[in-house]
Amino acid sequence: MQRAAMYEEGPPPSYESVVSAAPVAAALGSPFDAPLDPPFVPPRYLRPTGGRNSIRYSELAPLFDTTRVYLVDNKSTDVASLNYQNDHSNFLTTVIQNNDYSPGEASTQTINLDDRSHWGGDLKTILHTNMPNVNEFMFTNKFKARVMVSRSLTKDKQVELKYEWVEFTLPEGNYSETMTIDLMNNAIVEHYLKVGRQNGVLESDIGVKFDTRNFRLGFDPVTGLVMPGVYTNEAFHPDIILLPGCGVDFTHSRLSNLLGIRKRQPFQEGFRITYDDLEGGNIPALLDVDAYQASLKDDTEQGGDGAGGGNNSGSGAEENSNAAAAAMQPVEDMNDHAIRGDTFATRAEEKRAEAEAAAEAAAPAAQPEVEKPQKKPVIKPLTEDSKKRSYNLISNDSTFTQYRSWYLAYNYGDPQTGIRSWTLLCTPDVTCGSEQVYWSLPDMMQDPVTFRSTSQISNFPVVGAELLPVHSKSFYNDQAVYSQLIRQFTSLTHVFNRFPENQILARPPAPTITTVSENVPALTDHGTLPLRNSIGGVQRVTITDARRRTCPYVYKALGIVSPRVLSSRTF
């Protein structure tokens, strides 16, 4: 019977050492000179590596969980040879950090993770962007509006109006909410100066306006007018003002997020607001203050004329009474200015009061005035401003204008069938709705089960996701309108207030809560992701937006991957 070999206590020797020791032992006459059968060795013990958690790189000794892979977007050695045609959102980087390796040589190297184990990598990323809030890439610098482009007379003297949908483009930049609204209004006015004015369109026909006021403040339900004669110059919420035939279209624009106007079903196609949609949002007309004050002044003058006629008949008596009062006026001495202890009146004032009382007693009794019917004050709507621009009243006897406000229709219109039923008033987002970004490491991470391997950037498997690091920052400025007025004279921003005499076309007031767009670096921990067992020396890193496009506004992209064993592959 074949006897088993005896070994010292400890870990079993390797298979190669046992096989090579058998002939030597037989030659020396060892008791174990019988030929040995190959022992059974489990598959997980077949390799002379440093362990199941070993990481082998090139000809170096195996390492144990000490390797970190750094993904850097602007390594100087990678720029000329790997990234000359790439940007910070789609780049190649060498993960072999030896200085004596060129990018070409590093691309031939690999980092091998022990294939008897399942490996994962803890992925942490740092992302920094420098994206303005108004730009073409994010569809935030354009919007469409339906405006009047022509006014003419037909052969039978009928007014013919022509409307067209026009696309307006804003200059790119990082603007506050107030400045963006001013630029939108300025784009409409510039189109009027270029097209509408040349075709007979009046200034009062500018039918699209973005504002921030509540035009119903000061509304009197009895007269149906805004009784102060002016609209309250206070910002409440961004608003859209339309004339008949006009409208705005945000189907391919994200500027509606800046205005705080959204759809209740945001995933439905199209976003167009027309004049007919704003039913119940007509802006009330202003009181004609000049006519009202003139009517009151006429009543006063008529009353004064009647009294004057009575006094003229007794002009001699009036002169005599005045002369008597002058004669009775005492000569003031030095003690007349002393203040007594029981009253604040001086002696001179007391004497003067006594003289006036004596003069009234000496004057003849005044004739009783004949009461006349008092004239009612004139209360009528203001039809035009001081520059003869019409306020577009619905009719001569109406107290409402043809202008319709989205804000008024939303708050005062029918909530069941009006604009409130399918639009939503929300907080203005000066970032115009920041989207998400996706991280892809196609050469390092195993493809998730929901993706398949591909070479197209727009279809790279996604291994991480985060919000675009662009935030809306708000602060309170109680003197916003005052600052706006000062800047109008110092920075010459009166170009945004081309019609200051018109209460509707005037520049909208700045809100007290000012919001700006800010790029804030983001540090994100994406958790543990499954790694490939063989990692190439050159890795591709791709950051795509919600439409799976590389983002040119990525300013810095860093990634750190820490490999570790997740579980055994052979158990």
Swiss-Prot record:
Cited function: Major capsid protein that self-associates to form penton base pentamers, each in the shape of a pentagon, situated at the 12 vertices of the pseudo T=25 capsid. Involved in virus secondary attachment to host cell after initial attachment by the fiber protein. Binds host integrin heterodimer ITGAV-ITGB5 (alphaV-beta5) thereby triggering clathrin-mediated endocytosis of virions. Mediates initial virus attachment to CXADR-negative cells. Binding to integrins ITGAV-ITGB5 also seems to induce macropinocytosis uptake of the virus.
Induction: Expressed in the late phase of the viral replicative cycle.
Keyword Phosphoprotein applies: yes
GO molecular function annotation: structural molecule activity
Residue span of region Disordered: 298-324, 347-383
InterPro entries listed in its UniProt record: Adeno_Penton_B
Naturally occurring in which organism (per UniProt): Human adenovirus C serotype 2 (HAdV-2)
Name this polypeptide is given: Penton protein
One BP term from GO: virion attachment to host cell
